[in-house]
């Protein structure tokens, strides 16, 4: 049975069958005094104890960085928890060989985003109290890791009016990204360098499946990461066009709609109250003036995409867009 000395005498803190015990309820620079006695299986004391006890001032040991790993956000540092301390102070080694403080935290991990591809980073750590004073030593050699950007992940592929929109995660320390699509022969073909984290591929065809991958590049256009060799795939299905403007003109109702990537043309429909949709015009343009609209009547239009054979290849807005013909 282990006891610690309090202002009111000895306080029991632990019964154990082992021959060692670690007291984690400690404070920095606190001196604690312990004693102990034997017990039987029923918890009865069966020995005396040292009434003076044994004392120890608690000084936090130096933390150990147990893991350094490359992530999409930078180098992630993980270290062991130290009992009784408020937090930790991280340092990195400068080019001149000194240590520079860069983060105070109460956690036991942190990701350094201030990294550069292929640059070696060296870190060390020490404990701090709630006032920011250091309360432990530190490993003067530190722990080192070369930052190698991880391959980006395409997180979303979606059909839009502009084509297939690709979105991917940001990778720390890189200049930009290089996009590739898979060719019919199975190889990868580069088609776009960008510093953004999304891009819309307009070079698509209806019902064709496109496969993409991506890697990081530096400012000179050199690749600095690997890539996902299987890629991410999406079948391009044209979205329904949207009529953006309806105007009365001397020749009829002028309808204008947005362009949809990869399609041959568009089919315009009209209907009147209580009626059904009637085809007005097939066109490769994104506007048309309907001279057949009845004057004084509320007329509603919608539009869908067609291929070169006149087959519809998109849905349409069933509510449509309306105007009263003057």
Where are the model-predicted features located?
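Proline-enriched interdomain boundary motifs that mark the N-terminal boundary
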Residues: 59-68, 148-157, 237-246
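Hydrophobic loop/turn residues within beta-sheet-rich immunoglobulin-like superfamily modules
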Residues: 26, 71, 82, 115, ...
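Beta-strand-rich modules
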Residues: 23-42, 112-132, 201-221, 290-311
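Extracellular fibronectin type III
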Residues: 41-60, 130-149, 219-238, 308-326
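Conserved aromatic anchor
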Residues: 74-84, 162-173, 251-262
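Arginine-selective low-complexity/disordered segments
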Residues: 1, 10-12, 30, 37-38, ...
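Intrinsically disordered, low-complexity linker/propeptide segments enriched in Ser/Thr/Gly/Pro
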Residues: 1-6, 13-16, 22, 34-38, ...
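Recognizes extended acidic, P/S/T-rich segments that occur
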Residues: 2-28, 89-118, 178-207, 267-294
């Amino acid at each position: 049975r282990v006891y610690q000395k309090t202002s009111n005498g000895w306080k029991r803190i632990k019964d154990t069958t082992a021959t060692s015990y670690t007291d984690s309820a400690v404070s920095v620079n606190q001196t604690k005094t312990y004693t102990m006695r034997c017990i039987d299986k029923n918890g009865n004391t069966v020995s005396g104890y040292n009434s003076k006890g044994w004392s120890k001032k608690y000084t936090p040991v130096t933390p150990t960085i147990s893991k350094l790993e490359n992530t999409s956000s930078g180098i992630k540092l993980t270290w062991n928890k130290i009992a009784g301390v408020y937090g930790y102070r991280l340092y990195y080694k400068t080019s001149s060989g000194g240590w520079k403080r860069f983060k105070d935290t109460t956690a036991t991990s942190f990701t350094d985003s201030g990294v550069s591809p292929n640059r070696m980073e060296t870190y060390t750590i020490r404990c701090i109290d709630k006032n920011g004073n250091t309360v432990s030593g530190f490993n003067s050699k530190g722990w080192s890791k070369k930052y190698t950007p991880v391959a980006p992940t395409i997180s979303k592929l979606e059909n839009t009016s502009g084509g297939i929109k690709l979105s991917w995660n940001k990778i720390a320390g890189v200049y930009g990204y290089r996009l590739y699509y898979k060719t019919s022969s199975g190889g990868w073909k580069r088609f776009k360098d960008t510093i953004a984290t999304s891009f819309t591929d307009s070079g698509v065809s209806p019902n064709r499946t496109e496969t993409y991958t991506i890697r990081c590049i530096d400012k000179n256009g050199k690749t600095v990461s690997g890539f996902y060799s299987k890629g991410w795939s999406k079948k391009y299905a044209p979205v329904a066009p949207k009529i953006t403007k309806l105007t009365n003109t001397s020749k009829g109702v002028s309808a204008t709609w947005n362009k949809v990537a990869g399609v041959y043309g568009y089919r315009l429909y009209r209907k009147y109250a209580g009626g059904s949709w009637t085809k007005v015009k097939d066109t490769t343009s994104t506007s048309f003036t309907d001279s057949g609209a009845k004057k004084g009547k509320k007329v509603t239009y919608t539009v869908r995409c067609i291929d070169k054979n006149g087959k519809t290849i998109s849905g349409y807005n069933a509510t449509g867009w309306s105007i009263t013909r003057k």
